[in-house]
Amino acid sequence: MSDIYNAPHLQRHNYKTDMSEQEKLFAKLNAKTDAESKRLQRYIAMADLSKQDGSPVKLITEKVLNLPTLKNLDIIETPEVITPELVFDLFNFPKDHPARSASDSYFLDANHVLRPHTSLMWKYYLDIPEIKKRLEENGSIGVLSFGKCYRRDEIDWQHSNILHQIDGFFVIRKDIKTLDQKDLENILVEVCEALYGKDVKYKFVVDHFPYTDPSVEMNIEMNGQMVEILGAGIAHPNVLKNLGIDPEKYNAWAFGFGSDRLAMIKQNIPDIRLLYSQDERVTKQLADLEHKFVPVSKYPPITRDISFIVDKSFDLNAYYELIREIAGSEMTEEVKLLDKYKNEAKFGKDKISYTFRTIYRSLDRTLTSEEVDTKHKKLEEVTIQKFGAVVR
C-alpha cells in the first residue's frame, strides 16, 4: 500500500464535535408524548453497539480503525442529529432525492433529522481550523468516524432501521497523488482480507451516490450469498467545493462500511437482531470475534399474510415502520412483499393490490398463535385506519 497513508505528518488526533445543541433537541423530544416522538425516543435510546463492550460491532470497529493503512488517520465523533441542509444540500443530494423525505429518514422536526449515515463527518472535520491548515501545509489529511445511524428500511435478517457505520475520508493534493477508484479498492480489499483472510470472496459493483463519482459498492460472500457491506467512491468535486476544498487542487476518496454486516459475516450471525440480544447463550459467543456463531435452540416461526388495496401513493417504508410499531422488532423476523399488481377494472383507478407475509419469531421464547393473531389483527385495523386500505 502506498506510503501516502503513512506520511510523517499523519498522526492520529481525536476530535469531538460540540454536542450541546443535540442535547437540547433530545431534551425537547423527550418532553413530547405523541406516538412518533415516543418511537424516536426508543430508537435514540438503543445502545450504540460500536461503543458497547462485548459487542462484535465494537470489536470490528476497533480492528478496522487500527489497520496499517488507516491507523494514522484522525477520528472524529459527530452529532446524531443534523440539519437537512448539512446532510443533503452540502452532499449534493438532488431536491427530489427520496432520502430527503420522511418516508426514508427520521425527522425530529422540519429542521432536524437523525443522521442516515456518518459521511456527514466530512463537514465537521473540515470545519476544524487546524485541519485545513494541516492540509495546506502538508498536502493531505484523513479521518475516520463511526457510530449509530438511522434509516427507514425493510425488515429481514440483514436490515434494520438502526445501523452502525465506519466512515473514512482522505484528501490529498493532486500533484502528490491523483486518486482513482483502484486506490480506494486496494484499501477496501485490505480491510476485508484483514477481517476474513486472503481467501475472502468479494466483488465490486458500480453504484451511484450523490457525493461520490465514480461510486462503487462492495459485496462479500456469506454462506453462498453475496452481502453488501459498503458504499464508496471518489469524492464529488461539487461536494469538495461545498466544503471549502478546491477540487482543481485536491481530490479525495471516501467509504462507509456497514459494521453490523461486517460483524455478522465475521461470526456467521444469521439474524441482525442477535446483535442486541441479552441472552447469555448469545452474548458469550458474540464477545469473541473469532468465534463462529452456533445457533441457540431456534424457536418456531408463525407466518401470517395480509392482502389489501390502497392508493398508488402507498409508502412501503412507512408500512415497514408500522409493522415494527405494531408487532415489535423483537417479534418480527421478516416481512416479504409477495405480490403487487394493478387491475383498474377490479380495484379502481390509481389503486394497487399488495400482499405481505410477516414471519413472527422471537429470539428468546416460543410465540403463541393467540398473541400473534392479536398483533396481526391490530396490524389489519391500523392498515385500514392509516392508509385507507381495503383488506381483502
What are these regions, as identified by a protein language model?
Residues 53, 57-61, 180-188, 312-320, ...:
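Generic alpha-helical secondary structure
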Residues 165, 169-191, 195-196, 265-289, ...:
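An acidic, glycine-/histidine-flanked metal-binding catalytic module
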Residues 75-102, 198-223, 337-346:
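Beta-rich nucleic-acid/ligand-interaction surfaces
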Residues 139-151, 197-202, 333-340:
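Conserved short secondary-structure elements within globular domains
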Residues 2-162, 171, 226, 231-240, ...:
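Class II aminoacyl-tRNA synthetase-like tRNA-binding/catalytic domains
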Residues 61-69, 185-193, 320-324, 376-384:
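Generic solvent-exposed, charged/amphipathic alpha-helical segments
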Residues 59-71, 121, 132-134, 186-191, ...:
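Positively charged, Gly/Ser-enriched RNA/tRNA-binding surfaces
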Residues 210-223, 227-392:
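A carboxyl-terminal module marker
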